[in-house]
Amino acid sequence: AQVFDGEVSWGINMMSQQPEKSDQETTDNLKLENNDFPDSFMDYKSKGYSAELIGKETFDGTETFKIKLTKEPKTIDGKKEDDITFYFFDTENYVPIAIQTMITQGPSKGMTMEITMSDYQEVEGLYFPFSQTQGIKDQPSLPLIIDSIELNPIIDENEFKFPEN
């Protein structure tokens, strides 16, 4: 899990099972990602992003609009790298059914990460995908099934603080 309080990014080291602060580059990139909450397309122009309709494309048997979203560059290994994501919106009801982005670091660098979304359900007037998969394109992916969504719960800010002990 990755935790971010707005200033400090940290997670649990899988080997030691101890909390570890992230390096500055990771923290800076998480700050950029916070610009996208609750959605990358919300106010995209004022964030300096650009969106381009690539055209219609069939994705997993569904006709979609393929949109290229170019966001503020991320820093990877000390260099600014383009942050480009492709979204596939169902042409019938305009919900995203897939997201593809190039992996820019680590052992999977150069491969395409793919997230698929389905089983949209309404929660307090908003639609959310209750079924998702995430993985490398054209390889087995990890499923995520959501049982329920609670909007705007009260969460103690201390949950996000790095444990000092």
Please state what every model-predicted region is:
Residues 3-79, 106-109, 160-165:
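Flexible, processing/modification-adjacent segments and terminal tails
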Residues 60-162:
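Gly/Pro-enriched, hydrophobic low-complexity segments
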Residues 1-4, 85-87:
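Broad, structure-driven detector of short, well-ordered beta-strand segments within folded domains
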